[in-house]
């Protein structure tokens, strides 16, 4: 009984720190403005940066490698990335909010690999810059419009931004593209937006989009969705505006049973809750 009571207290304190209310996280501010921490990976993909290269990436953008405390502060307001990265003083780890079997070993908190003796190991980077441009965030509002960095001006080279949308249990997310103009190439290997029907960019891949044709609307299977924007080191374009609204579970659109395209809406089958 005592053990159970202690466990309940710990869970309450953790939930209170994240701002739980009515089954959702209440945080709808840009992570870069709130905590100043963001994730960076090499253009060639994940786990390509040495410690010196990771430092250079952060400093080039006017920041520095995040400390463990800074990464933990960002995690407590919803920063969740399933990728290990360099921190200050040669430390490596990554922030987990939602436990899962394929990310974080079923734990929450900073998954800490410790201070690495071999600074030539290759990981991603966690940078800290409270004055960075708006690039990514965690949204819990019932509806919102968000944009590529600098929109309506062209976005910069070498951007990697993540947006995480989290609504109440049982709700779905209706995603619509209002404007869309990215560098075009046949394989979408240069600049692109990726959409994931999940809490992170590890599971639930929906599609990768580039060029200037508006993608079709997408309705999620559950109450979470992740978007990733990446630009390369050369050509830029006008960027994008994306809108999402809440789909109530009682509405007809949320009752679709199969993946299909109706008009310009793409329905994704599945259960409602990812949290």
Curated annotation (Swiss-Prot):
<comment type="function">
    <text>Major regulator of extracellular matrix organization during tissue remodeling. Catalyzes the transfer of a heavy chain (HC) from inter-alpha-inhibitor (I-alpha-I) complex to hyaluronan. Cleaves the ester bond between the C-terminus of the HC and GalNAc residue of the chondroitin sulfate chain in I-alpha-I complex followed by transesterification of the HC to hyaluronan. In the process, potentiates the antiprotease function of I-alpha-I complex through release of free bikunin.</text>
</comment>
<keyword id="KW-0479">Metal-binding</keyword>
<keyword id="KW-0378">Hydrolase</keyword>
<dbReference type="GO" id="GO:0030335">
    <property type="term" value="P:positive regulation of cell migration"/>
</dbReference>
<dbReference type="GO" id="GO:0045671">
    <property type="term" value="P:negative regulation of osteoclast differentiation"/>
</dbReference>
<feature type="compositionally biased region" description="Polar residues">
    <location>
        <begin position="253"/>
        <end position="264"/>
    </location>
</feature>
<dbReference type="GO" id="GO:0005615">
    <property type="term" value="C:extracellular space"/>
</dbReference>
<dbReference type="InterPro" id="IPR000859">
    <property type="entry name" value="CUB_dom"/>
</dbReference>
<dbReference type="GO" id="GO:0106435">
    <property type="term" value="F:carboxylesterase activity"/>
</dbReference>
<keyword id="KW-0964">Secreted</keyword>
<keyword id="KW-1015">Disulfide bond</keyword>
<keyword id="KW-0732">Signal</keyword>
<dbReference type="InterPro" id="IPR052129">
    <property type="entry name" value="Spermadhesin-Link_domain"/>
</dbReference>
<feature type="binding site">
    <location>
        <position position="183"/>
    </location>
    <ligand>
        <name>Ca(2+)</name>
    </ligand>
</feature>
<dbReference type="InterPro" id="IPR016186">
    <property type="entry name" value="C-type_lectin-like/link_sf"/>
</dbReference>
<dbReference type="GO" id="GO:0090024">
    <property type="term" value="P:negative regulation of neutrophil chemotaxis"/>
</dbReference>
<dbReference type="GO" id="GO:0001968">
    <property type="term" value="F:fibronectin binding"/>
</dbReference>
<dbReference type="GO" id="GO:0005540">
    <property type="term" value="F:hyaluronic acid binding"/>
</dbReference>
<dbReference type="GO" id="GO:0050728">
    <property type="term" value="P:negative regulation of inflammatory response"/>
</dbReference>
<feature type="domain" description="Link">
    <location>
        <begin position="36"/>
        <end position="129"/>
    </location>
</feature>
<dbReference type="GO" id="GO:0045668">
    <property type="term" value="P:negative regulation of osteoblast differentiation"/>
</dbReference>
<dbReference type="GO" id="GO:0005576">
    <property type="term" value="C:extracellular region"/>
</dbReference>
<keyword id="KW-0106">Calcium</keyword>
<feature type="binding site">
    <location>
        <position position="234"/>
    </location>
    <ligand>
        <name>Ca(2+)</name>
    </ligand>
</feature>
<dbReference type="Pfam" id="PF00431">
    <property type="entry name" value="CUB"/>
</dbReference>
<comment type="subunit">
    <text>Interacts (via Link domain) with inter-alpha-inhibitor (I-alpha-I) component bikunin. Interacts with ITIH2/HC2; this interaction is required for transesterification of the HC to hyaluronan. Interacts (via Link and CUB domains) with ITIH1. Chondroitin sulfate may be required for the stability of the complex. Interacts (via Link domain) with various C-X-C and C-C chemokines including PF4, CXCL8, CXCL11, CXCL12, CCL2, CCL7, CCL19, CCL21, and CCL27; this interaction interferes with chemokine binding to glycosaminoglycans.</text>
</comment>
<protein>
    <recommendedName>
        <fullName>Tumor necrosis factor-inducible gene 6 protein</fullName>
    </recommendedName>
</protein>
<dbReference type="Pfam" id="PF00193">
    <property type="entry name" value="Xlink"/>
</dbReference>
<keyword id="KW-0325">Glycoprotein</keyword>
<feature type="disulfide bond">
    <location>
        <begin position="135"/>
        <end position="161"/>
    </location>
</feature>
<dbReference type="InterPro" id="IPR000538">
    <property type="entry name" value="Link_dom"/>
</dbReference>
<dbReference type="GO" id="GO:0005509">
    <property type="term" value="F:calcium ion binding"/>
</dbReference>
<feature type="disulfide bond">
    <location>
        <begin position="188"/>
        <end position="210"/>
    </location>
</feature>
<feature type="region of interest" description="Disordered">
    <location>
        <begin position="253"/>
        <end position="275"/>
    </location>
</feature>
<dbReference type="InterPro" id="IPR016187">
    <property type="entry name" value="CTDL_fold"/>
</dbReference>
<feature type="binding site">
    <location>
        <position position="235"/>
    </location>
    <ligand>
        <name>Ca(2+)</name>
    </ligand>
</feature>
<dbReference type="GO" id="GO:1903911">
    <property type="term" value="P:positive regulation of receptor clustering"/>
</dbReference>
<feature type="binding site">
    <location>
        <position position="191"/>
    </location>
    <ligand>
        <name>Ca(2+)</name>
    </ligand>
</feature>
<feature type="glycosylation site" description="N-linked (GlcNAc...) asparagine">
    <location>
        <position position="118"/>
    </location>
</feature>
<dbReference type="GO" id="GO:0030514">
    <property type="term" value="P:negative regulation of BMP signaling pathway"/>
</dbReference>
<feature type="glycosylation site" description="N-linked (GlcNAc...) asparagine">
    <location>
        <position position="258"/>
    </location>
</feature>
<feature type="binding site">
    <location>
        <position position="232"/>
    </location>
    <ligand>
        <name>Ca(2+)</name>
    </ligand>
</feature>
């Amino acid at each position: 009984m005592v053990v159970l009571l202690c466990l309940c207290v710990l869970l309450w304190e953790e939930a209170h720190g994240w701002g739980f209310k009515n089954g959702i996280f209440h945080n709808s501010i840009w992570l870069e403005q709130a905590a100043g921490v963001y994730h960076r990976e090499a253009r060639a993909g994940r786990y390509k940066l040495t410690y010196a290269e990771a430092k250079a990436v952060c400093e080039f953008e006017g920041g520095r490698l995040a400390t463990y405390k800074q990464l933990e502060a960002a995690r407590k307001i919803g920063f969740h990335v399933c990728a290990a990265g360099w921190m200050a003083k040669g430390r490596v780890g990554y922030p987990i909010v939602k436990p899962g079997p394929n990310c974080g070993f079923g734990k929450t908190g900073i998954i800490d690999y410790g201070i690495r003796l071999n600074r030539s190991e290759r990981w991603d980077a966690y940078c800290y810059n409270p004055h960075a441009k708006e690039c990514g965030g965690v949204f819990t509002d019932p509806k919102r419009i968000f944009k590529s960095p600098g929109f309506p001006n062209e976005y910069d080279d070498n951007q990697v931004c993540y947006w995480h949308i989290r609504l109440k249990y049982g709700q779905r997310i209706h995603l619509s593209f209002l404007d869309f103009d990215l560098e075009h190439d046949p394989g979408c290997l240069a600049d692109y937006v990726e959409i994931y029907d999940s809490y992170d960019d590890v599971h639930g891949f929906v599609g990768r989009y580039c060029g200037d044709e508006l993608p079709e609307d997408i309705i999620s299977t559950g109450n979470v969705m992740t978007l990733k924007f990446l630009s390369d080191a050369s050509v830029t374009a006008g960027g994008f505006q994306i809108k999402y609204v809440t789909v109530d579970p009682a509405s007809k659109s949320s009752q679709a049973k199969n993946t299909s395209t109706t008009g310009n809406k793409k329905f994704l089958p599945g259960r409602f809750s990812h949290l």
